[in-house]
Amino acid sequence: MTDTYLHETLVFDNKLSYIDNQRDTDGPAILLLPGWCHDHRVYKYLIQELDADFRVIVPNWRGHGLSPCEVPDFGYQEQVKDALEILDQLGVETFLPVSHSHGGWVLVELLEQAGPERAPRGIIMDWLMWAPKPDFAKSLTLLKDPERWREGTHGLFDVWLDGHDEKRVRHHLLEEMADYGYDCWGRSGRVIEDAYGRNGSPMQMMANLTKTRPIRHIFSQPTEPEYEKINSDFAEQHPWFSYAKLGGPTHFPAIDVPDRAAVHIREFATAIRQGQ
């Protein structure tokens, strides 16, 4: 169904595809931001949950989409510019950004640049909130290596599946994300590593927003109690931050528990409609 909503446009001399269901609703538009090395297909089940009630837009990043291709290097700053340009072309004013994984770097910078009137709230899904631990740092190093990047992806796939035979997620990993080669995976390792280096951690980046506003982290992984504790501690220190555990089996709640993710999106969208 989602591919019927697929469009193309020219953004800063780059031909980008994007999803827009063109639903005429009383705002905000829901802006779903993919992470690296996947595209609008990661959100196809979540779009089904939201389609009837919201305008839903999903930008595909440079080199991403149904026909991935090699492109000049870019990072999350360019992703922010591309997303805002697509919204401007579509005449979208108020929007609720929702990100998956390291699309979170885009979301926070998008909040900074768009300001609280245009983007009053944000939702991040399954984003590693602490500084990279050794295993993840090793994965980033492998992704950057043209000889070993596939080893890096296989290790990440195992972590993300967490021993579960979740058919929808396996299809996404092995059929959809498999479309992407070293150009994209290597770039993801470089950009993510650089983002942690620049910002310290996602929590530090959020805390450094010029104008903070409600942000909620909804996640299934990691499952360690200490991970929930850092979210809880951050929420206690920053009243604008909240979190919710979704209890899904994998790193992809938009695929395996889209109904649970949609509950939080509806809550935040309703608050925006009510001027909160």
Curated annotation (Swiss-Prot):
**Changing residue 196 to A/K/R: reported impact?**
Strongly reduced affinity for substrate. Strongly reduced enzyme activity
Q: Which GO terms describe its biological process?
A: catabolic process
> Changing residue 102 to L: reported impact?
Strongly reduced enzyme activity
Question: Any idea of its EC number?
Answer: 1.13.11.48
Q: Please name the catalytic residues of this protein.
A: 251 (proton donor/acceptor)
* Keywords, in A-Z order: Dioxygenase, Oxidoreductase, Plasmid
- Resulting phenotype, residue 101 to A: Strongly reduced affinity for substrate. Strongly reduced enzyme activity
pH dependence per the entry: Optimum pH is 8-11.
Record-linked Pfam families? Abhydrolase_1
The coding gene here is hod
Instruction: Provide the protein name.
Output: 1H-3-hydroxy-4-oxoquinaldine 2,4-dioxygenase
User: What catalytic activity is recorded?
Assistant: 3-hydroxy-2-methyl-1H-quinolin-4-one + O2 = N-acetylanthranilate + CO + H(+)
State its role: Ring-cleaving dioxygenase involved in quinaldine degradation and utilization.
Which consequence is recorded for altering residue 126 to A? Answer: Strongly reduced enzyme activity
Q: Which Gene3D superfamilies match?
A: 1.10.210.20, alpha/beta hydrolase
Protein's organism: Paenarthrobacter nitroguajacolicus (Arthrobacter nitroguajacolicus)
Effect of substituting residue 102 to Q:
Reduces enzyme activity by about half
Signal peptide region: none
Per UniProt, the enzyme's principal EC class comes to oxidoreductase
